[in-house]
A protein has these predicted regions:
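Phosphate-binding loop of NTP-binding sites
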Residues: 1-76, 84-92
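Broad hydrophobic/π-residue packing in well-ordered secondary structure
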Residues: 52, 59, 66-67, 97-99, ...
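Generic structural signal for well-ordered, non-membrane alpha-helical segments
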Residues: 13, 81, 148-152
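Short, surface-exposed linear patches
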Residues: 27-28, 54, 71-75, 98-101, ...
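Residue-level detector of anion-binding/catalytic polar loops
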Residues: 26, 95, 165
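Adenine nucleotide phosphate-binding catalytic loops in nucleotide-utilizing enzymes
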Residues: 2, 101-169
Length: 169
């Protein structure tokens, strides 16, 4: 059972958790939202994947636990549109996968048309049991989820690490 920690607003974390559950019925993911109040409670958890959706500068300054959580994680999925996070992760040895709407992101969106989007893997990713090559993936997206594109990139990446391809959200 993969342990996934998500540093994000609670509603984003819940959206990601529900979508992962819906799209990976045979894999039981344990997904935990991490915030300033809960960080001490999860300080000893080794996350298979740590997702960083928001700026963690203040959280790092106020808690030594986050550095330890980052250090112990196998994969770190980070929003590369938040530049401050990239400098914090400079010396981390985990598999770092970036996502965002910039040319340097590992996972980005190459196009959106009505209810379809193309998610682009721009660099090889070492998944748990395979390698994900550079390529585009077509994903159907419901109209009410169009404003959650960052979350869709996170969901795609988590599933891909475990060999699953997101087709509809």
């Amino acid at each position: 059972m993969p342990f996934v920690g998500i540093i994000s607003k609670e509603n984003d974390s819940n959206f990601i958790k529900n979508a992962i559950s819906k799209n990976s019925k045979e894999s039981n993911f344990e997904i935990i939202n991490i915030n300033r109040k809960s960080i001490e409670n999860v300080k000893n958890v080794k996350f298979d994947i740590l997702v960083i959706c928001e700026n963690i500068e203040k959280m790092i300054k106020n808690s030594s636990y986050l550095e330890e959580i980052i250090r112990k994680s196998d994969y770190i999925i980070v929003n590369s549109d938040i530049k401050e996070n990239l400098s914090i992760l400079k010396n981390v040895e985990a598999n770092i996968i970036t996502y965002g709407f910039n040319a340097k992101a590992t996972i980005t969106i190459s196009s959106i048309k009505e209810e379809k989007m193309m998610i682009c893997v721009q660099r090889k990713i070492k998944a748990v049991n395979s390698i994900i090559e550079e390529q585009d993936f077509n994903v159907e997206i419901e109209k009410n989820n169009v404003n959650k594109l960052y979350n869709v990139l996170v969901i795609f990446t988590i599933l891909a690490i475990y060999g699953k391809i997101l087709q509809k959200i």
